[in-house]
Amino acid sequence: MLLSFHPILEGDVNRLCAGRDPDPEDLAAMDKATAILLPQGCRESLYRAARRACARVFPNYEARFAYPGKTGQVKLFRELGLPHPESLIFSNIEDFNTRYPDPDKMPLAPPLMVKRDW
């Protein structure tokens, strides 16, 4: 039985789990599934429950949850040796000020972009 949590891609059984963790009915449906389709906006709790219940889960979100956010993407690209823009990661503004206290000696020259990790 193909179980779909995707709002557009239909399966034999269709469930929506948007904005919430999987409930007992979702988990029971997963236990009966031979394959599970997940939505793009998948919570980690839904993904982990699907992986525990079924060997065939699409898509594979392992990298997404192992390397969350923008800083996670940079770390993943570095580990895999993939090209990416030069990136510096700071845990907060105090970390930046500690590492670069002199405003005349910034680590990067313009043009540059500052992003929050979310």
What are these regions (language model features)?
Residues 64-118:
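Active-site nucleotide/adenylate-binding loops and adjacent lid/helix of ATP-dependent enzymes
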Residues 1-65, 72, 94:
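ATP-binding N-terminal substructure of ATP-dependent carboxylate-amine bond-forming enzymes
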